[in-house]
Curated annotation (Swiss-Prot):
One of its GO terms (biological process) is translational termination. It comes from Listeria innocua serovar 6a (strain ATCC BAA-680 / CLIP 11262). SUPFAM superfamilies: Ribosome recycling factor, RRF. Keywords: Cytoplasm, Protein biosynthesis. The keyword Nucleotide-binding does not apply. GO terms for molecular function: ribosomal large subunit binding. InterPro entries: Ribosome_recyc_fac, Ribosome_recyc_fac_dom, RRF_sf. This is Ribosome-recycling factor.
Length: 185
């Protein structure tokens, strides 16, 4: 039962790390990356459809995204969605594909993005700490019910803390890598 609490906690902490990685992937770092368009949706036959499901997105150059829609009639809609988005990018439409040039980031914008990265990282750390708290509460319930001894409670509590420390270390590493990517000129 207590091993179950540990494995569930570990799984939840890994999910928090993965969510952070996905979230940071959508932050523009001055380099072309197909995940920039992950949150972008287009109204396609009455349904909000993600662009990455209706077009091929490739990175031909370091600062260029090439969007090739499977259905050429939707090209204008994708262009409008990009212009309306908060990406700050202007697509170049040549009738069959869209080209997105990724401009260099200004120093001020880099600092804003680093703040955003730190905020996302802090939210992930809070999620991990909440998972730790839930695990400790579950272990205390097991001890109260007589399923585990007080010594087991202490031992499993230390294991939960080790998982938490490891997860926070991973989050710090992910954050540091993203900050370095953003600050790279």
């Amino acid at each position: 039962m207590s091993k179950e609490v540990l494995s569930k906690s570990k799984e939840k902490m890994e999910k928090a790390e993965q969510a952070l990685t996905r979230q940071l992937g959508t932050i523009r770092a001055g380099r072309a990356n197909a995940s920039l368009l992950d949150r972008l949706t287009v109204d396609y036959y009455g349904a909000a459809t993600p662009v990455n499901q209706m077009a091929s997105i490739s990175v031909p150059e370091a600062r260029m995204l090439l969007i090739t829609p499977y259905d050429k009639t939707i090209l204008g809609e994708i262009e409008k969605a990009i212009l309306k988005s908060d990406l700050g990018l202007t697509p170049n439409n040549d009738g069959s594909v869209l080209r997105l040039s990724i401009p260099q980031l200004t120093e001020e914008r880099r600092k804003e993005l680093v703040k955003e990265v730190k905020k996302e990282a802090e939210e992930a750390k809070v999620a991990v700490r909440n998972i730790r708290r839930e695990a400790n509460e579950d272990l205390k319930k097991l001890e109260k019910n007589g399923d585990i001894t007080e010594d087991d409670l202490r031992s499993y509590g230390e294991d939960v803390q080790k998982l938490t420390d490891e997860s926070i270390k991973n989050i710090d590493s992910i954050t540091k890598d993203k900050e370095a990517e953003i600050l790279e000129v």
